[in-house]
């Protein structure tokens, strides 16, 4: 019977979560969904000084916004300390691990001497038990670290789903500390126990973890576990070609939401940031899940391109349901000082203005003209466009608009043409002053569409001002 696929996302809550981080959640999530398996969220919070609940909340918020649902968790490593300590004790009892009393000063001196001899700095196994070996007496009052007895000789081999076959000689690996003097377990050890207990079958993570993998495999095998399939993703680079990070100016995932990006655009963009399905650039969440596989993960670093993301977001804004968009745009309009209630139906306004917008914020900036409370026209613009010679044309326009049997865009456009023909004017001569009077600004979408949305009463009232 084939084992059920189980993947995990295991972030450390030590800062905000950026696009590179969330991509490491998206791929295992998509693979679990594709394989009808389970996606587990594990919070690796053993760095107590740097971890925070606020950072955990941001992770959960980002995943919820992107609709990356979890099947199990979140599990917190700090709540599993008893389990880790029990496994450490078991390993010592089974002689898979041992206490080491070498002080930090002794270890530093050892490494410095090794460097001076041109050797790789490493623990030399002073306290490692061996047949016939006499160990030094434990120093009084010193709490030891616990080290894993890494295999001697041979190598660790795994077929990485991204990088291919990787082989690391055990001679390159010293005996890893798995528990500190106070008994707290170390990162690499906790990861192994978690992956074993949670029956993780596929570990899809950043390639900064490649060096941890041989150590984790050796510990897992010592505990009787079977190593999962590993897929180490190449780094995501920022615009400058540096590794994406907060230090190098990366924005939090929730920052994209607050800037007016749609979750489906972010998911589509991240899916292509290290994976491909032929030449497909735009695809739905359902298509992504259907197509996703480990074989087509990229082997080279992917570079973030904000213009590409903006282009995708524009596509999804244009395709989105107008009622849904209206609900998303409303807070942006209100943040700009607009009052949506009492104005034109926002979904209709969104339908008019959304096509040229790259973000919801840009939709709001254009839509704001329908919801401004202050319609004061700048004197310079009034002097330029609201001249005495144009007033009769505005009055004629208002009279004909007031007589329209139906307030429709096409009929409004026909009235404009009629007035323009009667006065021998071109459209800007009449449209600009009308824009100023009705919208308070010169830049608007098509004037007939704008007047239709404002409604007859508002338009006639403002033209009479």
Swiss-Prot record:
A motif ('KMSKS' region) lies at residues 243-247. GO terms for molecular function: ATP binding; glutamate-tRNA ligase activity; tRNA binding; zinc ion binding. ATP binds at residue 246. One of its GO terms (biological process) is glutamyl-tRNA aminoacylation. A motif ('HIGH' region) lies at residues 11-21. Residues 118-139 are annotated as: Disordered. The keyword Methyltransferase does not apply. It is found in: Cytoplasm. Coiled coil: none annotated. It comes from the Bacteria. It catalyses: tRNA(Glu) + L-glutamate + ATP = L-glutamyl-tRNA(Glu) + AMP + diphosphate. It is an enzyme of class 6 (ligase). InterPro entries: aa-tRNA-synth_I_cd-bd, aa-tRNA-synth_I_codon-bd_sub2, aa-tRNA-synth_I_CS, aa_tRNA-synth_I_cd-bd_sf, Glu-tRNA-ligase_bac/mito, Glu-tRNA-synth_I_codon-bd_sub1, Glu/Gln-tRNA-synth, Glu/Gln-tRNA-synth_Ib_cat-dom. One of its GO terms (cellular component) is cytosol. Keywords: Aminoacyl-tRNA synthetase, ATP-binding, Cytoplasm, Ligase, Nucleotide-binding, Protein biosynthesis. Its main location: cytoplasm. Monomer. Catalyzes the attachment of glutamate to tRNA(Glu) in a two-step reaction: glutamate is first activated by ATP to form Glu-AMP and then transferred to the acceptor end of tRNA(Glu). Belongs to the class-I aminoacyl-tRNA synthetase family. Glutamate--tRNA ligase type 1 subfamily. This is Glutamate--tRNA ligase.
